[in-house]
Structures are given as C-alpha cells and as structure tokens.
Amino acid sequence: TEDTVRKNAEYMAAHLKDYGWEYIVVDIQWYQPTAASHDYEPFADLVMDGYGRLMPAENRFPSAAGGVGFKPLAEYVHSLGLKFGIHIMRGMPRMAAHRRLPILGCDATCAQAANPNSICAWNPDMYGLRCDLPAARAYYDSIFQLYASWGVDYVKVDDIAREYPHCAKEIEVISAACRACGRDMVLSLSPGPAPLEQAEHLKRYANMWRLTDDFWDSWPQLKAMFGRAEKWCIHAGPGHWPDLDMLPAGAIRQVQSPEEWTHFTQAELRTMMTLWCIMPAPLMFGGELTKLDAFTLNLITNR
C-alpha cells in the first residue's frame, strides 16, 4: 500500500541513504484493487487507462486518484533524496486485448498487438506481445512514456529473463522503449535463471537480470548461489549487473505472518551479504525496513 511505501522510504532516507541505498520499488500487483496476498487471483479486474496501460489501484494508492498515477508518490520519494521504481509483467493486460482498446501513438488495437499464446505460467494477467509488429513497439513506448511522466527511475520487468529464445525480441523492444522514453531508468529483468549463453544479449539490452527463481531464506538456496556467482561474475560491470535477487533478511513474509523473521542465522546472513558484495551483485533488501533490528541494520550498512 501507499502507506507502507512511504514509511519504508522515510526509513531508508533516515537510516540507509548515506550508505548507498537509494531505490524504493513498488512490487507486483499495484494495479489490482483486490490484491491481498502472495497468491495471484486469476482474471482479477485490473485498473487501466483508456489505452490499456496499467494504473495504480486508488484504494491502495490514494495519491493516484484522478488518473495521475504514481506521480505524487514518486515526487514524495524524490523529495527524500531517493529514487522510485515499479514492477511490471511483460506484455499487456489480457483485459486490454479483450476490450480491443486503442494503442496510444498508432492505429492498431491492443488485440492486434497481443499474442494470446504467450501467457505467464504463474500469473495469468497478461498476454505477451507480437514483437514483429510496430504496434508492439508502440504499446511499449506508450507505457514507458507514462512511467517517465510519473518520474519512475527503475522498472523491473517480470516473466522474461529466463524465457529465451522466444522472448529475446521482446527484451529488445522493451529495452528500446525504455531508452527512448526521455528519462534515465534502470531496466531489470526477472525471474531467473537467465541463460548464461545469453550473457552478451542481456548485457546489451538490460541493466540487471536475475540468475535464479525467487530466492528465499534457505541454506541450500544460498549455497547454490556460489556456483551461479562463479559463472556469472565476469559479466558484472558498470551498466550491466547479474542479479542474485533480493536479500531475504529481517522481517519477511509480512502478508502471511507479520511477526515472522528470516530463517537465516546471523552467520548465514553474513555469508549472503559477503557473497553479494564480492560478486558484486545489486543489493535489494526484501524485508520490512521499519522493523529492522540492530544486527541487520549494521550488516547492510557495514557499520
């Protein structure tokens, strides 16, 4: 919710900004009024504008009222000296295609650009796009121009990083739209495992890409990260960073169990943080910042 985003941004500005933490990212389903858990609701009603572009659910993000989108929330985050990001799924809402909504900037409809055979296996909200058609580029241009108008600094595109070879062209079209939108944005691709043989393609078209599926507080998962980091570390450099996923530290699983803490021991947390830093991989914190304990705060600030 907007309240959660604002409180975490305020905490980051007060306690973490001086140590290099700078992005506040709104995760999945911000456009679904009924989203209430980590389970996806098949064929839920999603909030869109007249061009099939997803908009924040106003019951959860009240500053978006009146069709202004995330602009007020992004402005607040920027006022704290931080940057603002969002999560999206690749493609367009299936609702937009079924309603044959127009695509901004061209004569085609969403139905003409959609690929009904390209659907995420775990979230049925979207259709992939027919990226051989100009209408697909026009749609992606329209959403990135919208995000630029909101003041978005970071876009995480899901259901794409491991979907080679059939999503290679879609990655290229998304990248082109992002670069042409008139605002500098980090382009992050998920989920993994991204294929190692596509490293040069990923470095050319994205800033970050996930090496794994969702990473949780499990020692076997953490141990496996060493092998992935060893293979990918040579591809890390300015502008292109292999991503080991968020750090599952502190208070996580807040929807299911608000009092639950990470299952990692302090030794495992030190191991995780050390590996991410020596690779180096992007540091994205996955817990509730306002509940940080002294150990975790010291760990992620290296104090």
Locate predicted features:
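An acidic-aromatic substrate-binding cleft motif
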Residues: 1
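Aromatic-lined carbohydrate-binding/catalytic grooves of carbohydrate-active enzymes
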Residues: 4, 8, 12-164
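Active-site-proximal structural scaffolding
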Residues: 5, 66, 140, 167, ...
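Residues within well-ordered alpha-helices
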Residues: 72-73, 143, 174, 274, ...
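Short low-complexity, flexible loop/linker segments enriched in glycine and/or proline
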Residues: 99-103, 169-174, 202-203
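Glycan-recognition surfaces
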Residues: 113-118, 131-132, 138, 142, ...
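Extracytoplasmic, non-cytosolic globular domains
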Residues: 143-193
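Glycan-recognition and catalytic regions of carbohydrate-active enzymes
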Residues: 284-303
